[in-house]
């Protein structure tokens, strides 16, 4: 498997924690210069201090102007070769109780956040000899789950964007793909487990089992497994892989 080209610059949105931080760390180990972008300065600075990234910029992915400014600042340090559009949030509720504001939150962060990052990074990336865009979607972008209709709709939109944009860019050296993790052992899923416990009275093991039962391997995915897939897609040997939505879910979907 071919690795990364020499010292590419990678920018990871939502890179201060969870899957995003793991991806950033793996990219650093593979020889990339890594900038993490997110809302919380403390988490971003901690990633830099821990060696999981080299630089950190603060921006809310729902704010197009802020994202554009942050990505321009990062590109001024070194042109961006790799964009990992990872930032996301999840909320659950029955459809009847999912109001318009909830749908807007899910779309604004999980879909428009991806759009904003790509629109800011792509123009200069297209002119470079190598470019990789990877969106972190979800198995909820490939199938439905009860009680997360807003989240699932947003993640389906990400997969549709990836498939369409890959065709537009097929003549360039830029590939566009999505990774679609199943339930992953992160603080985001820990929050979902807490929510299940609160609403159902189940203990932590039972609540975690409610999520891991979707995985044919009977477990939660690890952030490292997602990061390994992203790293493969960023490699020079993956130049023919574009427009794909790759499930990292132990056989689910």
Task: Show the residue positions of the predicted features.
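C-terminal substrate-recognition "lid" of short-chain dehydrogenase/reductases
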Residues: 217-248
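Active-site helix of classical SDR
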Residues: 118, 154, 162
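Residue(s) in the substrate-gating loop at a strand-loop-helix junction
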Residues: 138
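Substrate-binding pocket helix/loop in short-chain dehydrogenase/reductase
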Residues: 94-95, 99-107, 211
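Alpha-helical segment proximal to the catalytic Tyr-Lys
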Residues: 123, 167-168, 239
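Short, small/polar-rich loop/turn modules that mediate ligand/substrate recognition or access, typified
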Residues: 170, 175, 241-243
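Conserved glycine-rich cofactor-binding loop
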Residues: 16-17
């Amino acid at each position: 498997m071919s690795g990364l080209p020499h010292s590419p610059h990678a920018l990871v949105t939502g890179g201060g924690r969870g899957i995003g931080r793991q991806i950033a760390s793996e990219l650093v180990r593979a020889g990339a210069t890594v900038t993490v972008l997110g809302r919380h300065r403390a988490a971003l600075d901690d990633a830099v201090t821990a060696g999981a990234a080299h630089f950190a910029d603060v921006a809310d992915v729902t704010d197009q102007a802020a994202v554009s400014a942050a990505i321009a600042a990062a590109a001024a340090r070194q042109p961006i070769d790799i964009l990992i559009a990872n930032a996301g949030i999840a909320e659950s509720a029955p459809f009847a109780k999912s109001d318009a504001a909830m749908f807007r939150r899910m779309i604004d962060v999980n879909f428009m956040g991806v759009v904003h990052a790509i629109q800011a990074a792509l123009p200069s990336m297209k002119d470079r000899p190598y470019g990789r865009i990877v969106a972190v979607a979800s198995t909820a972008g490939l199938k439905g789950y009860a009680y997360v209709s807003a989240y699932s709709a947003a993640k389906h939109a990400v997969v549709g964007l990836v498939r369409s944009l890959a065709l537009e860019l097929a003549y360039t050296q830029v590939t566009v793909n999505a990774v679609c993790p199943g339930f992953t052992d992160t603080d985001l899923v820990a929050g979902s487990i807490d929510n299940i416990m609160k609403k159902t009275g189940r203990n932590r093991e039972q609540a975690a089992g409610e999520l891991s039962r979707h995985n044919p391997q009977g477990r939660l995915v690890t952030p490292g497994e997602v990061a390994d897939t992203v790293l493969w897609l960023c490699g020079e040997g993956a130049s023919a892989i574009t427009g794909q939505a790759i499930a990292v879910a132990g056989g689910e979907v």
